[in-house]
Amino acid sequence: MNEQQLESIKRKNEWLHDLVEVEFPTKESLEGREIYNRMLEQKTYEVSSNTLLLDNESNLSVEDIFLVDFHRLTVMFSILQAQRWADKHEQEMIVEFLTQIILTPEFELYVGFKEGEPVGAAIVSQYEGNTLISDLVVSQNLDKRQFVCDLGKKLNHDQKLSETIVIEN
């Protein structure tokens, strides 16, 4: 990975870290941040071109994937994200941490739906010609790689997909 790609990952992680850097953070949100940061140590990343994402068949249409732009979707995003942890207490702390997210154009949250049920979520950010797709989570009804491709098509449709994609595994 090049410097810009590494920086895009660092920026996203710093943004999430700073969510609870407030005057009176809850102990639950601080614990959730610690749990989240431990998970980050296990993450790997791959670099791909946008054509590899766009050439696959779609499972979800661009109309099935929504940019999170209000609190209820933020809560759905957080609940989906919490499924990445097996422990119930850790799930609760992750929800507490992630529901602190303040929506910003630099770091966009997406939630995918199938038959009215939330089935996938991710964070997307852009930095110097790179699109970072991170914090991927899918329900048992959807393949993670498929969701990345479907999200890529949504981003391309909205003219938000760079040539180079960094995908968090």
Predicted regions and their residues:
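Generic structural signal for short, flexible, solvent-exposed coil/loop and linker residues
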Residues: 4-5, 13, 74, 99-101, ...
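Short amphipathic alpha-helix that is part of the acyltransferase structural core
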Residues: 42, 50-97
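A short acidic/small-residue loop/turn micro-motif
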Residues: 124-128
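Short N-terminal helix-initiation segments at or just after the protein's N-terminus
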Residues: 51-60, 111-114, 129, 133
